[in-house]
Amino acid sequence: TRGVGAKVGETRGISWGEDVFTIPHFLVYTCSERGEAARNAMSPDITDLLGNDVRKPTALVHFERDMPLTEQKVMTLIIFHCQVADKDESGFYHIRKSFVRRFLGWDDSHNYPRIYEAFEKIFDNTIRWNLLGKDKTFKSLKCKLIVSLLEPTDTGPFIGFKLHPDLEPAIKDPRLFARIKLIMMAILAKPKYAFPLYEILSDCYSRGERVARLSLQELKESLGIAGPYYDQFIAFKKEVLRPNLAAINQNTDCQVAYD
């Protein structure tokens, strides 16, 4: 299908092709040791996880995306890590920095200060969740994703953090969620909105919606596009929708069209 002109407030449809996703085995890890050995167990090896999905709660897919893309991806990794790993006796999760680096597609970079900076920004930001009210099992609220962050000098190759208690139950055992392939974080590094759009559309598909109907304003808000930018659909289609859907169609196992 082909898009035509539209203004903010009008609803557009985005549809999915057949056989979009296969669901790989979901790995579950437990640990009971202490010290660095325990943190190693709490941070599963990346080679075991490359094909995995994160069960990202719908309410945590639709949020105010004001932070940079790196921080958004790290948030998804935090959610996944907390689903497959245990916290320590003090309630902290320990995620390996190299795990984050690899999934961000930074294989040739050892910019670990930037990774910790991403955690700091996430820690410093209060976020509005369930932005569009799609998750009826989850109350809409504003809170941080992580509420405590250990200093990097105390954690070595790991980053230690605590989840917000209002979000942790939904993260550990989500009732309504999107299945998002972790490897797509690196594959959909560009264009800017490819991975956020992939998350949003994956959520629609996971909930059985083969056609996602969103107004232009809703889609802009979901992607974190603020202000009057792209208020006309023609500009939005040219600069945002067309290049980002092309990246999704070319690099993932899904085919998406818009109307």
What do these predicted regions represent?
Residues 5, 9-259:
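Charged, alpha-helix-forming regions
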